[in-house]
Amino acid sequence: DITRTYIFGEADALQRKIWNIEKEIQLAVFNASNLNTTCSAIDDASRVVLEKYNLGPDYKLPGLPHRTGHGIGLDIHEYPYIIRGDMTPLEVGMTFSNEPMICVPNKFGIRLEDHIFMTAEGPKWFTQLAHSIENPFNL
């Protein structure tokens, strides 16, 4: 359950900018993912980056119209959800997606989805991150 966005042809300036913002949001989510931090607070961390670039605010477009991520288990998409109002604290052993899709209405959307698991030392990446818009699969 990972997602990569790539461009057929060459990315224009707006596509490149939004891809880089998406990457910045992913890193902000990872950095906010500390033990005992609530899922709601992690979603808030993604929206702080959006607002820095005059996207959103909140769940408005252009921006991130849905949750930042979800728990991962036997059903792939499951509780808890990385969304405003989910007060579940992160605990050792939890695994969740980090997938803050940015939508630019009538133009395009960009989503990079990776996974984080929580250890006693804090968050660890479970998947290999996309390298760049030109090489999203790190080939």
Per-region residue spans from a language model:
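Active-site neighborhoods and metal-handling regions in enzymes and metal-associated proteins
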Residues: D1-L139
